[in-house]
């Protein structure tokens, strides 16, 4: 356009100019224009044009063209070309006319002549020509430039093309090369590859760093030189070893020889040896690896694994793998097949070489073992842990070749002749570890696990147990290396030969892997020192000191390290043994994670990788013995003891256990040999474990393993006590380690760790330790089965429970293990610190003094909120809102964890987070996938394996870890683990909660009070709740076996996972949900209690969760809250209750499940299940629920509303359901201004129904129906109480059909009113109601149909009579008292009849807590035997009357003590509701575990507690019920102490509700019997289970909160109340949650009242 402008203007000028000259031009003549003038004028014009340019240039110059003048002329010529031809004059005139104007501007005002005009004409032409020429030139230039540009582009394109072709050629070459490559060559690793890949996350840092350094392709020159030197020295060493192998001592002497050479050239020798090993393998596999650097880097171990079988390394590899649980696991699975191969360690050197190369793969074998264990996998794992372990423990105890260590290997091991020598072998390997320690510290958790060749001494470790006096030092030294490596960051010191294997074990350590690098350095000196010291056995004391100084790298840990070391250093021998214990304990803790892994091995889950840390240690130490240990140990509850016990047992005995306990055996071996050394190192590790989370995890499982091993080998009480104490202490640390996994970043409060270290070492020698030993001992006779884990659990009361709690958050420690909790020991210290140094409930002693201690410890933990991880583990085993790493991991680990959450917390589990365990997820995702979340489910990490190592599961998914330790040698622990994997978050939380709740009724509540989300009691109950642990063991073994599924909660009564879920839920929904979490726990336990739950464990926990979700979807918030809230109440479930429930559960749950499947309505199934369960467990529940109810009422008026919405849900069983129902009615009535008469009416229904049921156990159809109707009536009344409470109750009276009609009506009315979870589920748990709120009509329909099934007429009569009785509250109260006494009497009288009637059995189970040992044993044994399920067989064995009685006493003491003490009162408040619901949940869940898996899992713990309570005192229970009844107002909540002290309180609605639970219990009792008899029984169990599930949901604070939130007004109000209640200790969780979660307006009223 500028050109256009200029062009136009020049033309203008021409035109304007010409008009003036026109006359002259015409006069002169058109032809007169002379060319000369043209040029000058042309120039002039150009000048003019340019001159005017100032005006034009403004327009024209803007054109970027460098020729402003030419463009104007160009148009001018065009115009002027024409003028000259014909229009010259015109143009000239115009131009002339215009030019004068333009000329003045240009300064040419004088040009007006004709000549000027002509000149202008010529000028225009010239200008046009010039302009045209210039334009053409410009165009040509532009074209030239364009051509050059195009040429450049073409050249660039050509270059690019050439490059592309070159690249294509290269790619083609690469493709050709790749096509030539065989993927399997790199994946060749003999099934270790995929496991390794799974675990490589854990050990990749250590291994890959090392591999990169050591692999031929990636080796730096200096490293290559070192490699060459190492190869040379290794060859020399091998020659030495071979020459020695010719002699008997080749196994033991060779390691010593290796130790001597490596020590001199510490880093070099170690590195060289490792490189030699690797180079040897690399040379062998170089061709395979060299093709791809990755292959060299990653595949070296894998190739080695697959390759070594060709040469002697095959044996070594196998030996290493057993040490590193790869082959050990197969050996375990194959009984001795792999052991024969692997255990005959070809040469310690070769073993070390292969370990160095196959550390990852070695660790992987743990998971492989899980696969190999498949022959017995799911059931075998559970069975082995619960039954097989329980049964085999005696065998395995003698079985030195527990996992199939061939006798020749044993002999070779023995050839060393002295356990010390063999252990020294291991220690020698350990000594080289320091060099590797740096590597491991730098990049590996693996390194901490792979500690040293101490594994070699595994068999001698068994010997050590036998040779307690002398062997302690030797065994300490022996196990010190392994444990040091496992537990201590210093373990890396053992890397050279031992480190490889140890590392392979180390790798499985979840927690360690993630956060072990730093502590390793600090601990490494300790490990090395200890290893060195252990080499000298007594030199170890100085080494310990040097250890403490040498672990400055772990500065945070050092204070503790110094303390622990100093304390242990006091006496070399004692210190060695203690340190060995401590180390063993810590190893047990570390192995705990490993053990979970071990279980994973058994289960073939990634957890085994973690387990390998401990397992590898064990297997490495003593292939055969280690596996025995591992087998028994990681069986946690059952297998650990047997493996330890069966050390002397022939290999034949070992295979079954091996399959189940293979990893545990490894862990045990690791633990025993390493534990001794680790006694000091372990203490040191406790400080270091802060980073050594994996080690801590391993310590967890390993603690139990170590405890068992040490217990078995160290039968003497003194050593055993010390050992057990340290072991448990470390186990607690380990558990804490899991929970702190997420706080691991916080460094877990080093000072606390230090204090804990001091405390731990102090406790190691403290009576508490010995008391733990008693617990240890209690099951020790049966094969360390219960003894070890009991110890773990008891000691873990503080430590295990805390540790479990730690797991919960991590999991998805979540499942994942909680790498954040690096040091189990450190956590233990924190735990001590937190729980109170004086009251150390590390292990509950046989004397049962620890429960109070446990409460104390939990309390302390709660008090020490500053140490969140420690607190977390205690509170919720990974359910802290802050770091539900386990829960979140879980997936656990898991939790974790997912996590293994972290690895599991979150995790979670977690879960799945152990999960996740995940690590929390570090724990392979079996649990968390989580959690497994790997080990910690990695929860989240989740949920590695439910069957194998419940302890591991708990570790993996903190929830179950807690249970595992709690139920130490019982199926309970196992069940918890199983449950954990499934619901890393929810179930893990439940398990945690249950474990905590039963363990620390007061402590847990207090903890909850301190940090509701943390579920303070979680850890404590699990570990410390000996009764809970023991009894669940009996009943859970079946569930555990049937459900080796990661959620082993079916077996475990205290579903720590559930609890974890609770914590998770609180984290998700409300800080106050911790109470809800507790409630949640009870629900899962019942499921696990159920054999059907056991059968459905794999499906059930998830199924349970699915129902939970279904309910949650229906009333998501409410149900979720209820579900999570319920488990803690369930925790009160006694092992006996669990067993009794389990017996029925198998049939009922399955039947109910069928019904549930038949009836698409989950609510209906739940209802029927609830009905059946409520009736069947009614006898147990009357006590459990009544106690729980009274406790709930007395504990918290605030919780009353919470319980009202959540109590029913909270009550896993029908009893609790009905009680909660009553609560709901009562509380709702109060909140809703419903008259006490109406509440009485409802209560009367339930009570009458219950009485009827109790009175007529056989006509249970009627009672069941009645029970269902009354409950429904209650709920419906609760739901519709404001409008039609009386009418509805009366309507119930007319008949089942009418009632059904009304109930169906109520659902619409009640659902709207109770749109929250509670109201709908009258029969079902109130937790069911959230689910049922949506499906109330169907549910009620189903329920009523069920009622009809039972007996329409009797139901009608009973309802009418109940309605009649409703008005007479006093009568009802007396009735209830009668019922309570009747239940008590019945429980006493029916103990022998436990199998006859569900109610009787339940009552008997409830009575288990009562003084009668037969009551305890009979219900469990009879139930399990009646079920004829293998699972129960093992529980019976592990559960001695004595043990059960002790557990019950412990539980009673806790319950009573809690009630008595102020702190306990607070906890009681929170716990009582939990207990009540737990009790109910347990009862109901047994029949309906399938449907109610989550609830069942939660309920067992509470039921256990409730059973204890009821057993403790029927009178007390009656008082509590009465008080609770009087305490009907949600607003008025008395503490448990208040209830106990002032039995009679305002009894209008509260009393009624309190009574009604008893009635419900009675009805449940009758119902149980009826279930078996009548077609309704299938439905009834389903109803119970479903109802239980619903109840669970309602009880779950989280789930319930969610559902409550769904309803606008009521839910909002309820939620607020819920939050307040949750914030309240545990009070609101139970009752408030039930109320709130209940969809009914009563919930709101209750909440308001409680508020």
Swiss-Prot record:
Residues 629-648, 980-993, 1408-1423, 1465-1496, 1588-1618 have a biased composition (Low complexity). Belongs to the NHS family. This is Actin remodeling regulator NHS. One of its GO terms (cellular component) is apical plasma membrane. Residues 1-262 are annotated as: WAVE homology domain (WHD). The keyword Lyase does not apply. It is linked to Nance-Horan syndrome: Rare X-linked disorder characterized by congenital cataracts, dental anomalies, dysmorphic features, and, in some cases, intellectual disability. Distinctive dental anomalies are seen in affected males, including supernumerary incisors and crown shaped permanent teeth. Characteristic facial features are anteverted pinnae, long face, and prominent nasal bridge and nose. Carrier females display milder variable symptoms of disease with lens opacities often involving the posterior Y sutures, and on occasion dental anomalies and the characteristic facial features described. The keyword Transit peptide does not apply. Residues 507-521, 859-874, 1640-1651 have a biased composition (Basic and acidic residues). May function in cell morphology by maintaining the integrity of the circumferential actin ring and controlling lamellipod formation. Involved in the regulation eye, tooth, brain and craniofacial development. Interacts with the tight junction protein TJP1/ZO-1. Associates with actin-rich structures. Interacts with BRK1 and with all three members of the WAVE protein family, WASF1, WASF2 and WASF3. Residues 1-104, 235-274, 288-314, 494-598, 620-669, 835-888, 980-1004, 1017-1071, 1383-1436, 1454-1509, 1526-1651 are annotated as: Disordered. Detected at low levels in all tissues analyzed. Detected in fetal and adult brain, lens, retina, retinal pigment epithelium, placenta, lymphocytes and fibroblasts. Levels in retinal pigment epithelium, placenta, lymphocytes, and fibroblasts are very low. Expressed also in kidney, lung and thymus. Pfam families: NHS (PF15273). Coiled coil: none annotated. It comes from Homo sapiens (Human). Residues 548-558, 657-669, 1020-1037, 1555-1568 have a biased composition (Polar residues). Residues 65-76 have a biased composition (Pro residues). Keywords: Cataract, Cell junction, Cell membrane, Cell projection, Cytoplasm, Membrane, Phosphoprotein, Tight junction.
């Amino acid at each position: 356009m500028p050109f256009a402008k200029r062009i136009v203007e020049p033309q203008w000028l021409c035109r304007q100019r010409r008009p003036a000259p026109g006359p002259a031009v015409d006069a002169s003549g058109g032809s007169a224009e002379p060319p000369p003038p043209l040029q000058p004028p042309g120039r002039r014009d150009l000048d003019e044009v340019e001159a005017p340019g100032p005006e034009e240039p403004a327009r024209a110059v803007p054109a970027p063209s460098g020729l402003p003048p030419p463009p104007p002329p160009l148009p001018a010529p065009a115009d002027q070309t024409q003028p000259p031809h014909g229009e010259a004059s015109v143009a000239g005139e115009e131009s002339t006319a215009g030019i004068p104007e333009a000329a003045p501007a240009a300064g040419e005002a004088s040009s007006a002549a004709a000549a000027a005009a002509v000149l202008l004409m010529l000028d225009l032409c010239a200008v046009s020509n010039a302009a045209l020429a210039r334009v053409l030139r410009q165009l040509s230039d532009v074209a030239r430039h364009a051509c050059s540009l195009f040429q450049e582009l073409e050249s660039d394109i050509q270059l690019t093309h050439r490059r592309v072709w070159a690249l294509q050629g290269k790619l083609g070459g690469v493709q050709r090369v790749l096509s030539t490559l065989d993927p399997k060559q790199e994946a060749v690793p003999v099934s270790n590859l995929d496991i390794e890949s799974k675990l490589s996350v854990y050990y990749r840092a250590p291994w890959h760093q090392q591999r990169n350094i050591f692999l031929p392709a990636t080796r730096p020159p200096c490293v290559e030189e070192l490699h060459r030197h190492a190869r040379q020295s290794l060859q020399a060493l091998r020659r030495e070893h071979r020459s020695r192998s010719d002699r008997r001592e080749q196994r033991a002497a060779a390691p010593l020889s290796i130790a001597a050479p490596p020590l001199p050239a510490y880093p070099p020798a170690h590195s060289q040896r490792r490189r030699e090993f690797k180079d040897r393998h690399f040379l062998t596999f170089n061709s395979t690896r060299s093709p791809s650097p990755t292959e060299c880097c990653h595949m070296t171990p894998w190739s080695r694994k697959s390759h070594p079988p060709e040469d002697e390394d095959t044996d070594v590899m196998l030996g290493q793998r057993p040490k590193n649980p790869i082959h050990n696991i197969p050996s375990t699975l194959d009984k001795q097949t792999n052991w024969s191969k692997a255990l005959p360690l070809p040469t310690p050197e070769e073993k070390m070489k292969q370990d160095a190369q196959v550390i990852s793969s070695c660790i992987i074998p743990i998971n492989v073992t899980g696969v190999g264990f498949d022959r017995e996998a799911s059931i075998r794992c559970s069975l082995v842990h619960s039954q097989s372990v329980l049964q085999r423990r005696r065998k395995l105890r003698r079985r030195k070749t527990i996992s199939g260590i061939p006798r020749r290997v044993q002999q070779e091991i023995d050839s060393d002749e002295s356990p010390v020598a063999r252990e020294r072998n291991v220690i020698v390997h350990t000594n080289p570890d320091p060099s590797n320690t740096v590597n491991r510290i730098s990049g590996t958790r693996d390194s901490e696990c792979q500690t040293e060749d101490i594994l070699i001494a595994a068999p001698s470790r068994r010997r050590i147990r036998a040779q307690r006096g002398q062997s302690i030092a030797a065994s300490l030294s022996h196990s010190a290396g392994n444990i040091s490596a496992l537990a201590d960051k210093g373990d890396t010191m053992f890397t050279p030969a031992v480190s490889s294997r140890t590392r392979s074990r180390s790798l499985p350590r979840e927690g360690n892997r993630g956060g072990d690098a730093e502590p390793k350095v600090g601990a490494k000196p300790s490990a090395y020192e200890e290893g060195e010291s252990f080499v000298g056995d007594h030199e170890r004391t100085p080494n310990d000191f040097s250890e403490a100084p040498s672990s400055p790298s772990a500065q945070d840990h050092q204070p503790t390290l110094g303390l622990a070391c100093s304390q242990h250093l006091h006496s070399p021998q004692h210190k060695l043994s203690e340190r060995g214990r401590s180390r063993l304990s810590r190893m047990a803790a570390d192995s705990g994670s490993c053990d979970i892994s071990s279980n994973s091995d058994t289960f073939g889950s990634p957890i085994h990788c973690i387990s390998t840390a401990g397992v590898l240690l064990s297997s490495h130490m003593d292939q055969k013995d280690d596996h025995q240990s591992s087998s028994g140990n990681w069986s946690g509850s059952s297998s650990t003891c047997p493996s330890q016990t069966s050390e002397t047992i022939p290999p034949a005995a070992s295979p079954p256990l091996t399959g189940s306990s293979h990893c545990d055996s490894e862990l045990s071996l690791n633990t025993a040999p390493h534990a001794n050394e680790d006694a000091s190192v372990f203490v040191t590790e406790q400080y270091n474990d802060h980073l050594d989370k994996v080690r801590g995890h391993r310590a967890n499982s390993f603690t139990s393993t170590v405890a068992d091993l040490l217990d078995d080998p160290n039968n003497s009480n003194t050593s055993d006590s010390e050992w057990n104490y340290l072991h448990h202490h470390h186990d607690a640390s380990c558990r804490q380690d899991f929970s702190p996994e997420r706080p691991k970043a916080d460094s877990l409060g080093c000072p606390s760790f230090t204090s804990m270290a001091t405390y731990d070492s102090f406790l190691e020698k403290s009576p508490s330790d010995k008391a733990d030993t008693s617990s240890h001992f209690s099951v020790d006779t049966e094969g360390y089965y219960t003894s070890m884990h009991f110890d773990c659990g008891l000691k873990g009361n503080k430590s295990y429970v805390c540790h479990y709690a730690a797991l919960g958050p991590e999991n998805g420690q979540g499942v994942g293990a909680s790498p954040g909790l690096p040091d189990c020991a450190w956590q233990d210290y924190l735990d001590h610190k937190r729980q109170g140094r004086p009251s150390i409930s590390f292990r509950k002693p046989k004397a049962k003094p620890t429960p109070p201690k446990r409460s104390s410890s939990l309390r302390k933990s709660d008090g020490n909120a500053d140490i969140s991880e420690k607190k977390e583990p205690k509170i919720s085993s990974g359910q802290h809102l802050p770091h539900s790493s386990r829960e979140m991991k879980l997936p656990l680990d898991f939790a974790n964890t997912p996590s293994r959450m972290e690895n599991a917390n979150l995790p979670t589990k977690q879960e799945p987070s152990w999960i996740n365990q995940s690590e929390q997820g570090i724990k392979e995702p079996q649990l968390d996938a989580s959690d497994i979340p790997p080990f910690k489910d990695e929860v989240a990490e989740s949920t590695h394996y439910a069957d194998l190592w419940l302890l591991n599961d708990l570790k993996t998914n903190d929830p179950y870890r807690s249970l595992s330790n709690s139920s130490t040698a019982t199926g309970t622990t196992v069940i918890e683990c199983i449950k954990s994997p499934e619901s890393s978050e929810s179930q893990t939380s439940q398990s945690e909660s249950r474990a905590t709740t039963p363990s620390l009724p007061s402590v847990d509540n207090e903890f909850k009070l301190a940090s509701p989300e943390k579920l303070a009691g979680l850890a404590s109950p699990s570990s410390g709740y000996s009764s809970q642990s023991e009894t669940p063991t009996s009943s859970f073994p079946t569930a555990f076996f049937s459900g080796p599924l990661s959620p082993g909660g079916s077996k475990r009564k205290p579903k720590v996972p559930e609890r974890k879920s609770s914590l998770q839920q609180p984290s998700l929904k409300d800080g106050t949900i911790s109470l809800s979490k507790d409630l949640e726990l009870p629900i899962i336990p019942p499921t696990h209690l159920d054999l059907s739950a056991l059968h459905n464990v794999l499906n059930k926990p998830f199924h349970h969760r699915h129902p939970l979700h279904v309910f949650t979807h229906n009333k998501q918030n409410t149900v979720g809250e209820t579900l999570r809230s319920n488990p803690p109440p369930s925790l009160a479930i006694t092992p006996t209750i669990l067993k009794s429930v389990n017996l029925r559960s198998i049939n009922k749950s399955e039947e109910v499940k069928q019904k549930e499947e038949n009836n698409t309505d989950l609510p209906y199934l739940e209802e029927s299940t609830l009905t059946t369960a409520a009736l069947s467990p009614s006898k147990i529940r009357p006590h459990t629920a009544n106690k729980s109810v009274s406790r709930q009422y007395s504990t918290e008026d605030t919780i009353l509303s919470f319980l009202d919405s959540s109590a029913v849900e909270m009550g896993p069983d029908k009893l609790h359901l009905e009680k909660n129902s009553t609560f709901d009615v009562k509380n709702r009535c109060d909140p809703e201004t419903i008259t006490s008469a109406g509440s009485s009416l409802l209560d009367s229904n339930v009570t009458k129904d219950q009485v009827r049921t109790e009175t007529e156990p056989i006509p249970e159809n009627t009672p069941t129906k009645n029970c269902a109707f009354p409950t429904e009536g209650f709920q419906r009344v609760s739901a519709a109480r404001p409008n039609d409470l009386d009418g509805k109750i009366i309507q119930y009276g007319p008949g089942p059909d009418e009632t059904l009609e009304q109930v169906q009506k109520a659902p619409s009315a009640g659902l709207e009113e109770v749109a929250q979870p509670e109201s709908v589920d009258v029969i079902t748990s109130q937790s069911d109601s959230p689910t049922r709120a949506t499906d109330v009509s169907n549910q009620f329909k189903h329920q009523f149909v069920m009622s009809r099934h039972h007996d329409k007429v009797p139901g009608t009569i009973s309802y009418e009579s109940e309605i009649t009785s409703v008005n007479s509250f006093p009568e009802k109260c007396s009735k209830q008292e009668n019922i309570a006494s009747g239940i008590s009497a019945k429980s006493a009288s029916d103990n022998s009849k436990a199998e006859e009637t569900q109610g009787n059995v339940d009552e008997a189970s409830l009575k288990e807590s009562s003084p009668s040992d037969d009551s305890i044993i009979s219900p469990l044994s009879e139930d399990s035997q009646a079920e004829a399920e293998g699972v129960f067989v093992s529980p019976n064995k592990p559960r001695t009357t004595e043990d059960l009685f002790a557990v019950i006493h412990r539980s009673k003491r806790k319950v009573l003590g809690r009630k008595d003490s102020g702190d306990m009162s607070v906890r009681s408040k929170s716990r009582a509701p939990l207990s009540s619901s737990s009790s109910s949940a347990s009862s109901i869940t047994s029949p309906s575990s399938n449907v109610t898996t989550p609830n069942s899992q939660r309920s067992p713990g509470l039921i256990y507690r409730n059973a204890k309570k009821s057993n403790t005192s029927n009178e007390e229970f009656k008082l509590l019920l009465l008080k609770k009844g009087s305490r009907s107002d949600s607003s008025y909540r008395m503490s448990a102490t208040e209830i106990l002290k002032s039995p009679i309180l305002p009894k209008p609605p509260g009393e009624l509700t309190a009574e009604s639970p008893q009635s419900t219990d009675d009805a449940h009792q009758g119902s149980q019997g009826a279930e078996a008899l009548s077609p309704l029984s299938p439905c009834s169990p389903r109803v119970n289970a479903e109802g239980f599930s619903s109840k669970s949901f309602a009880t779950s604070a989280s789930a319930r909160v969610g559902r409550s939130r769904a309803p606008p007004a009521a839910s909002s109000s309820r939620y607020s109340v819920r939050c307040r209640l949750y914030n309240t200790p545990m009070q609101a969780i139970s009752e408030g949650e039930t109320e709130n979660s209940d969809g009914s307006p009563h919930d709101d009223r209750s909440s308001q009242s409680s508020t």
